[in-house]
Amino acid sequence: VTEALLRRLDVATEAALEAGALLRSYVGGTLAIEEKRPGDLVTAADRASEDLILKILRRHFPEDVILTEESGQQGSPEGAYAWMIDPLDGTTNFAHGYPFAAVSIGLLQGREPVLGVVCDVFRGDLFRAVQGMGATRNRQPIRVSTTAELSRSLLVTGFAYDRRETPDNNYAEFCHFTHLTQGVRRGGSAALDLAYVATGQLDGYWERGLSPWDIAAGIVLVREAGGKVTAYDGSPVDVYSGRLLASNGWLHAALQEELAQVQPLPVSFPMRRDPRPAYQNRESLPVERVEFETEVVEE
């Protein structure tokens, strides 16, 4: 592990913790909400978190490329390192007061994820990993589960924003695995889904329609916790491909085999749109206040 990566880990940790604290300050207040496209929300909290993270990263690493969900790419494309930032992964959850959202900061060297920091906004947990150094939650080592049978597994997935318009919408896969496992969850934050695969609380994760900022950090967490991350067919994962399969390793071959057998369900219903403006008569949604009592243990 190079000194350059360790420096970036420290700065990413600082940025994630400060952004998490900032996002918690919005809890209990009201949020101005926009709908970028059906089901895809952005709030003032997203933008404030992104501004804070960008300020910290630019101050320390002006030469690095930065790709964020809200602002796109910044910096020289010739940079050796590229940051993948989701300032609020789980915006819809956050806007509704559902406590499952995260700050996700990943780092690529070339096209390879080498560093990941994920801060659970509501619980305050801090997940960190660097290639070759293992993975931690609140500075304590984490490992994937040893579940070796699909029938004993708990999986997690998600659905893309275009799920109403395409037959390749993950509905068939969701139904398929629901019958084969102890359950399939839909968390609403890819970063936290992957973090919980890394801790062993979930055994596997698959999803399509992903962006690099959704998964860059989580990929490193799962790998460094002893898990496996690939494309659906087992080939090396590309963070820009939009598809991902992650598991504890024990289940990976079985998950690949089952995914290959699933046929998409036909889209037989049109998207129903309310003719009224989004969130008519309320410019913002209330977010329930949650009290936090968290402490980051220093090494």
Labelled PLM ranges:
Residues 1-88, 250, 257, 266-299:
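N-terminal subdomain of lithium-sensitive/metallo-dependent phosphomonoesterases centered on the IMPase/IPPase/PAP
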